[in-house]
């Protein structure tokens, strides 16, 4: 679509037994990065004139899903398309996924706040899932990730961390007041070589 798609709220739902895709090595737009138990996307590429605005995903219980828990992105995979505005992922509980817990992409100043993510990747496999993290951002600017708890994230080939700043992370990314424990890959993965106290 053209223009700004605004005012989407997904709140106070229980979402479970979603049989999505958890394979990483699938063709583009068919892999685990293009679906989710809660999946909000924009067809094609975004711009200052064409993007998502005012997206709220809050207070949901998402569990036992074969795919990721929550995902926000655009359909085309371009790391410089950072245009979605006022995206909030808050107060969700995510347990036992087939891949990642939460991924937010293509957003300006997204807020990821007060979520619980346990056992990300519990329903995945080494052959299919390969690389995951609990909560992470990519192609974002000035993301704020705070007051989240992430535990028992699986590690397959690599990664397996609670948090991740991945490709296209720009501006200043802030992690504060989060609690990470018992994740097979540790606390945080940085794919962007960010500078401490400047970029993150």
Question: Where are the regions a protein language model picked out?
Answer:
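Repeated loop/turn-to-beta-strand initiation elements of outer-membrane beta-barrel proteins
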Residues: 19, 66, 110, 143-144
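Extracellular beta-strand/beta-solenoid scaffold signature
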Residues: 1, 23-52, 64-80, 84, ...
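Extended surface/linker regions that mediate inter-domain or inter-protein docking
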Residues: 14-16, 41, 62
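Flexible loop/turn segments at secondary-structure boundaries
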Residues: 79, 110-111, 143, 153, ...
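Core solenoid repeat modules with strong leucine/isoleucine-rich periodicity
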Residues: 118-134, 138-142, 146-155, 162-164, ...
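Short, solvent-exposed beta-strand-terminating loops
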Residues: 5, 18-25
């Amino acid at each position: 679509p053209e223009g700004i798609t605004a005012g989407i709220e997904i709140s106070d739902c229980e979402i479970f037994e979603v049989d999505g895709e958890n394979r990483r090595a699938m063709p583009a737009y068919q892999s685990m990065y293009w679906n989710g138990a809660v999946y909000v996307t924009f067809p094609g590429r975004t711009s200052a004139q064409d993007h998502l605005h005012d997206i709220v995903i809050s207070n949901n219980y998402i569990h036992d899903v074969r795919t990721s828990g929550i995902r926000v992105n655009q359909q085309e995979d371009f790391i410089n398309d950072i245009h979605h505005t006022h995206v909030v992922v808050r107060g969700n509980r995510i347990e036992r996924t087939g891949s990642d817990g939460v991924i937010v992409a293509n957003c300006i100043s997204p807020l990821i706040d007060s979520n619980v993510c346990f056992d990300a990747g519990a329903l995945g496999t080494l052959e299919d899932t390969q690389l995951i993290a609990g909560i992470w951002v990519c192609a974002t600017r000035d993301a704020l990730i705070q007051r989240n708890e992430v535990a028992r994230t699986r590690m397959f080939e690599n990664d397996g961390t609670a948090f991740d700043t991945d490709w296209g992370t720009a501006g200043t990314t802030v992690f504060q007041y989060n609690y990470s424990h018992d994740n097979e890959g540790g606390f945080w993965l940085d794919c962007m070589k960010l500078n401490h106290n400047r970029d993150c």
